[in-house]
Amino acid sequence: MAQNVQENEQVMSTEDLLQAQIELYHHCLAFIKSMALRAATDLRIPDAIHCNGGAATLTDLAAHVGLHPTKLSHLRRLMRVLTLSGIFTVHDGDGEATYTLTRVSRLLLSDGVERTHGLSQMVRVFVNPVAVASQFSLHEWFTVEKAAAVSLFEVAHGCTRWEMIANDSKDGSMFNAGMVEDSSVAMDIILRKSSNVFRGINSLVDVGGGYGAVAAAVVRAFPDIKCTVLDLPHIVAKAPSNNNIQFVGGDLFEFIPAADVVLLKCILHCWQHDDCVKIMRRCKEAISARDAGGKVILIEVVVGIGSNETVPKEMQLLFDVFMMYTDGIEREEHEWKKIFLEAGFSDYKIIPVLGVRSIIEVYP
């Protein structure tokens, strides 16, 4: 057997060997794209381009963000990676090259800049030292018995992700701002493509709804729906005032306010199977009967469901490994079905309108 393996290695062509090396190094250095994106976000390069009339040279960018002149050549190298990655577009003319925004970098414009949506805080949620450091503990987490008993995040930091968010105001503010951004984008898409999921509803509780971005979007589109947000007391205490939304501090494992519909956006993927069953049972206690419009609406990844394009499919799997750091998981349909049935629900429908994520309607 060993001899056959050696023979197969020996017959690898020169081109195969070369391509294998290139692919391996490409995987190893893929993190550079993430770090370059984070740097561009923190430097507010998208803002600089936007404020310069939508097109900016390296000199323009350096002046706007306050770079030292010695860093101009380094900025060119950074922008070269980001243009190849599709974050910006470069236009080579007779003079100095100019950079413009793409649909991706338009999402990185800051609050003070005219924009429809922004996801700059989500970039910081994904690409930050706390999250990245957790991934360096993967080997220990897989192989050391003591480490395997806790989350990947706990191995790296000695506390859970949620404890750090609660105790570190700067980290907590960044995380919650990111969730607001993500919810705003997701709800805009849902209300454009599948607003029917909210029609005929009189009342809705958004469980784990944070500062109320989802509920606010629902109320704007359907003013007659009575919306409540349930989250931990220290979260709702910081929620912005909204006369159309009631904020309730509490624990989703203990009590969920009664409503026609309970909505959970990206909550269950943070929990293991048994806890998800408990949460869904609480949801079932809270909602109306099915013939009265009662249902649970989940916004979650269903691995293998959605777009057939490579990037969304890969994103589902990347999300799944990323969620290991909180001991979370992205589930396939059969895993979701098992949770629903064990919690006492009769049926469900998957609506794959979010590319990577789906709407799941679950019926009592």
Curated annotation (Swiss-Prot):
Optimum temperature is 55 degrees Celsius. S-adenosyl-L-homocysteine binds at G208, D231, D251, K265. One of its GO terms (molecular function) is protein dimerization activity. Expressed in leaves, stems and flowers. Pathway: Aromatic compound metabolism; melatonin biosynthesis; melatonin from serotonin: step 1/2. It is found in: Cytoplasm. One of its GO terms (cellular component) is cytoplasm. This is Acetylserotonin O-methyltransferase 1. It comes from Oryza sativa subsp. japonica. The gene is ASMT1.
